[in-house]
UniProtKB/Swiss-Prot annotation:
GO terms for biological process: translation. The keyword RNA-binding applies. It comes from the Bacteria. This is Small ribosomal subunit protein uS7. One of its GO terms (molecular function) is structural constituent of ribosome. It comes from Nitrosospira multiformis (strain ATCC 25196 / NCIMB 11849 / C 71). Gene3D superfamilies: Ribosomal protein S7 domain. The lineage of its organism: Bacteria, Pseudomonadati, Pseudomonadota, Betaproteobacteria, Nitrosomonadales.
Length: 156
């Protein structure tokens, strides 16, 4: 527990193109080495590709992809009497969003398309339909939690 006052969460301003705070947060997640304009270009390019491919609103596809990737439970290691147990715990909403964005980014980076924009567009489109690497990661985490349900009484 920190002894000083609790630091308030910084409010993330909505992005300039879609006026959506989640898109702005995803820009920050995708950004490397402080190059925000490059991250924005990649995301907006991916959104344009999604609009061309599916004909749907890209922000709706993005939010659907996020909701399909958000984990409900995860496992945390807990040491009890010399043994490590994987204890399933519920994920708080802020961490749920952060994990979903991170998994989408990582799954997009592992894809085979040429540009990052194309990879991201493909991953977002697949995640919105309930397929893709990020959704697979979520299912894997849920399976681990289900398999270790017996240790749920070792709550944190």
């Amino acid at each position: 527990m920190p002894r000083r006052r609790e630091v308030p969460k910084r409010e993330i301003l909505p992005d300039p193109k879609y006026h959506n705070a989640e898109v702005a947060k995803f820009v920050n997640v995708l950004m490397t080495r402080g190059k925000k304009s490059v991250a924005e270009r990649i995301i907006y390019g991916a959104m344009d590709q999604i609009h061309k491919k599916t004909g749907k609103d890209p922000v709706e596809v993005f939010t659907q992809a996020l909701s399909n990737v958000r984990p409900m439970v995860e496992v945390k290691s807990r040491r009890v009497g010399g043994a490590n147990y994987q204890v399933p715990v519920e994920v708080r909403s802020i961490r749920r969003n952060a994990l979903a964005m991170r998994w989408l980014r990582d799954a997009a980076r592992k894809r085979a398309e040429k540009s990052m924009g194309a990879r991201l567009a493909g991953e977002l489109a697949e995640a919105a339909e309930g397929r893709g690497g990020a959704v697979k990661k979520r299912e894997e985490v849920h399976r681990m939690a289900e398999a270790n349900k017996a240790f749920a009484h070792y709550r944190f």
